[in-house]
Amino acid sequence: MKTALLSLILFSCHIWAVKHQAKKCTEDRECEEIWPGSTCQRARCRCPENYVRRKSPSREWVCLSVNDAATGQVGPPLTCPLPDGAGYQVILRGSSTNNLLSPPVLCSSKTNDCETGYECIQGLSPVDGLDGACCPDQITTCAHPIFDHESGTLERWGFDGSECVKFKWDPEKPSSANNFKTKLQCESYCVNIFA
């Protein structure tokens, strides 16, 4: 059963990668599907203001928020794309408990030397000579649990295993990478890779 599921996942990712390989955009909608607020400029998707575009082995590209979602101030130099503005919460950590106090697993975005289920995303600035952190890849992101915070004030979308559902998010509380700004982004990340 595990082998069949792994084969399906790998085949789906291969089909997705072929469909999205170095694709040039022609309209904003194509970019918006991958990252909310992105626009098509000169046949290339551009991230919104206060975001930087970074290469993603599983998604082609992602946008990193320069600002922390909880404080609105400039965020840490290493972060993951999701949750938006709080990606530092889901960086792979160098301990068995994987808590925020453990050091992050650093990597080189040129070699993508992260463990299975993670990919190297170049940070906002290098740390200790390495330019990236190991972040959940597309499949791992979609497999993470949804952290629905009753006290949350921000509406978000998460993949529950079959569809994208709405929930409330509090950026000051622990979260997972399964946290999308829009339903379209959630579907693009999770639902559509198995379609």
From Swiss-Prot:
Start and end residues of each BPTI/Kunitz inhibitor domain: 120-190
InterPro entries reported in the protein's UniProt record: Cuticle_assoc_divergent, Kunitz_BPTI, Kunitz_BPTI_sf
Domain of life of the native organism: Eukaryota
Keyword list, A-Z: Disulfide bond, Signal
Pfam families membership: Kunitz_BPTI
Function: Appears to lack serine protease inhibitor activity in vitro when tested with bovine pancreatic alpha-chymotrypsin and elastase. May be involved in cuticle biosynthesis.
Protein name: Kunitz-type protein bli-5
Recorded coiled-coil stretches: none
Annotated signal peptide: 1-17
GO molecular function list: serine-type endopeptidase inhibitor activity
Disulphide bond pairs: C120-C190, C164-C186
